[in-house]
Amino acid sequence: MFRVHCNKCFRHRKTDPAVPFHLTQCRHVICGPCLGQSSLEKNCPLCGQVLKAIQINRDMPTSVANYFADPLRFQQIYRKISKFQADQRASDNLGFYRQLQQLEQNKRQLEGFCKMEAQLNQKVVEEKKRIAELRTYIAYHENAQRMTRRRHSAGERFHTPEFKEAWNTSISTSDKSPSDMPSDSSRRSADLDTQSTRRRSFGSDTKGFRL
C-alpha cells in the first residue's frame, strides 16, 4: 500500500489528516488547497485534462476505493478469477470434444443402420420373390388336383350300373349276325297282322253302337 500524498505539492495525508485529498478522473491525487487553485482553470494541474475529482474517504465508490486497496488481495482475486475462467474454458472445451465424439459415434451408428436397412430391403425383395414362386407352385398343384378330380368323377360315371347295362346292350346288338335280324318281308307281314288285329278289336267294340 502506498502513502497517499498530493501529486502537486507532495503533502502527505498522515501528516495533515485534516486536509482533504481528491482523486481526479485522470488518476491523480490532489490535496484540497491545490484543487482549489486549479478549480479556477477547470483543468488538472498535472496533465491539463478536464478536472473532475472525487474526495478520498470511506464513502467513495468501490470502483474508486479499489485503487487504494492492497494489490496482493487483487492478485489473489485475479488468480482465483483466472483459475475459475480457465476451468470454465477447459470444461467448455471438454464438452465440445465430447460432443464431437458423440457426433462421430452417431455417424458410425447411422452408417451401420443404413447398411442394415439395405440388407433388410434386399431380404424383403428376395422373400417377395420366394413368395411369388410359392404362389405359382401352389396354383399349379391346385390346378393339377382339380384336373385329377374331374378325371376321377368322369371315370365313376362310366362305372355306374346303368352305363354298364347300356354298354352291354349296345355290344350285344352289335355282335348279332345279319341272319339273326328279321327280314323286311317278315317285318311287313308282322305289321299287317298287327293292323288286322287292331281292326277286329275295334269292330267288336263298336257292334252295339247306334246313332
From Swiss-Prot:
Region (Disordered): 149-211
Bias (Low complexity) ranges: 172-184
UniProt xrefs under PROSITE patterns: ZF_RING_1, ZF_RING_2
Any one GO molecular-function label of the UniProt entry: SUMO transferase activity
Keywords associated with the record: Chromosome, Chromosome partition, Meiosis, Metal-binding, Zinc, Zinc-finger
Coiled coil: none
Residue spans of biased composition, Basic and acidic residues class: 153-165
Other comments on record: Nenya, narya and vilya contain a RING-type zinc finger domain and are named after the Three Rings of Power given by the elves of Eregion in J.R.R. Tolkien's books.
UniProt tissue specificity: Expressed in nurse cell and pro-oocytes (at protein level).
Subunit structure as annotated in this protein's UniProt entry: May interact with itself, with nenya and vilya through its RING-type zinc finger.
Zinc finger (RING-type) in chain: 6-47
Protein name: RING finger protein narya
Main location: nucleus
Gene name, Swiss-Prot/TrEMBL: narya
InterPro entries, per the entry: Zip3/RNF212-like, Znf_RING, Znf_RING/FYVE/PHD, Znf_RING_CS
Organism: Drosophila melanogaster
Alphabetical list of PANTHER family matching this protein: RING FINGER PROTEIN NARYA-RELATED
GO biological process: homologous chromosome pairing at meiosis; positive regulation of meiotic DNA double-strand break formation; reciprocal meiotic recombination
